[in-house]
Amino acid sequence: MKKQAGFTLVELVVVIAVLGILAATALPRFVNVQSNARVAAGNGLAASLRSAANLARASWIAAGSQAAQVQVQMDGQAVTVNAAGWPTGDAPGITAALQQLDGQFVGGYNNGTATYTVGGFAACTVVYTAADGRVVTNLSPANCGGN
């Protein structure tokens, strides 16, 4: 007669218990992956805003640095700039300079600033100020949906 091979009930219970413990310790780590991804996306947006603002200002300087608010051309896209040469904090300004804005960023404009929320979290923001071309971020896993 052939002896049957397989796992005993005790061995199966031990393996399930070990897998449960591993899952309980690993799950919180995976929960923060989404908020960390939002922080990374926000940092990418901040870098894009800085680059777009600097490129628009460089175009303004190359065009003669006129003091009045004018438009500069960036890859065929008209970008409105202020008297200091920075893109204005609205759709014809900084948003036009970006040329593409992913749907995960929602922009709002108020008094020369453009505020973009990341991933739908109100505290997870990137703010562009048109007066001096400054970009300030409020990005942390806690602000962007994490614990």
Locate the predicted segments by residue.
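Phosphate-binding glycine-rich loops and adjacent basic patches that engage nucleotide phosphates
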Residues: 6-16, 53-65
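Alpha-helical interaction segments
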Residues: 19-20, 39-40, 50, 76, ...
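Membrane-proximal N-terminal amphipathic helix
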Residues: 37-63
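Periplasmic/extracellular, small/polar-rich flexible segments of pilin-like filament-forming proteins
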Residues: 58-147
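N-terminal single-pass transmembrane signal-anchor helix
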Residues: 1-34
